[in-house]
Curated annotation (Swiss-Prot):
Region of interest (Disordered), ranges: 1-23
Main location: plastid
Protein's UniProt name: Small ribosomal subunit protein uS11c
Transmembrane regions: none
Biological classification of the source: Eukaryota, Viridiplantae, Streptophyta, Embryophyta, Tracheophyta
Pfam family, one: Ribosomal_S11
Family: Belongs to the universal ribosomal protein uS11 family.
Gene Ontology cellular component annotations, sorted alphabetically: chloroplast; ribonucleoprotein complex; ribosome
Molecular functions (GO terms): rRNA binding; structural constituent of ribosome
Gene Ontology BP terms: translation
Originating gene: rps11
Localization terms from the record: Plastid, Chloroplast
PROSITE patterns in the cross-refs: RIBOSOMAL_S11 (PS00054)
Amino acid sequence: MAKPILRIGSRKNTRSGSRKNVRRIPKGVIHVQASFNNTIVTVTDVRGRVISWSSAGTCGFKGTRRGTPFAAQTAAGNAIRAVVDQGIQRAEVRIKGPGLGRDAALRAIRRSGILLSFVRDVTPMPHNGCRPPKKRRV
């Protein structure tokens, strides 16, 4: 028969509460990826470590409503609300993708009160790379 393993030490000494490390971040990078189907907003520090993120799907929008400008505005607001509590003051914005939520997400970021050092469009453009998908016939 196997003997039960006894645990040595008490639980009173361990720290209770959240394990999450709350960092003070003065400057960050806000990445907005706007596709036709969804908008994903990720806030990172300058080294690229993710601090907070949100998308239209996690904000409760499902189906075709995820691609709307209002869903992108809500996602940007949710992602930024978490990092404002951590003390972010300055940020740079990198927008990627052709979606409808580009401008709405940028408007929500501007309204949040964070100083934007610059806004950069980093949409990947092919130098005649892969063949695009065929045109839709509706």
